[in-house]
Amino acid sequence: MQSGSANRIIWNLVASRMDRYGYSIFCDDIRNEAGGKLSFIGCYNGVIFISEPFPLVLPKLCVHIHILSPASRPFSSIDVRCYLPGDDKPFSEEPIETPERHDQTELVANLKPDTGAPLFIVAATSLIFAPLKLRSPGLMRVRALIDADQELRLGSLRIEQAS
């Protein structure tokens, strides 16, 4: 009896923490391949070292974004915002088109319910900045405004002067 109670408490804790989340991949190029594959060329692992003095222009920088939401919380709207180091206002603001809420719910309802894994709705997009002007080192941040009221942090890339 006690063990069932503990399992229920743990399950409720896990279920309450399953919320929307996302991530970004920063790279030099994104290529569409045969079979619907994407290739990420020159991926950065949290930092990009710049050998030229600031300000400077990068020929291209790409960001691929994934946003996941529990199936019980379909998206109404998604607005992706990118911020350059030191800026409070986004230099890029891109909406991601989302299907109607009922279409998202119907799609999830048609999935096999016995997978054992939680079901998520996934939104993804690729942003290509060519060229990209950088005034100073610091953090390039990626955020998403979900349903016009929830800001989701999707990652950042530290831009540093190489020594």
Enumerate the predicted regions with their spans.
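Contiguous segments within soluble domain cores/interaction surfaces
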Residues: W11-P137, R141-I146, Q150-S163
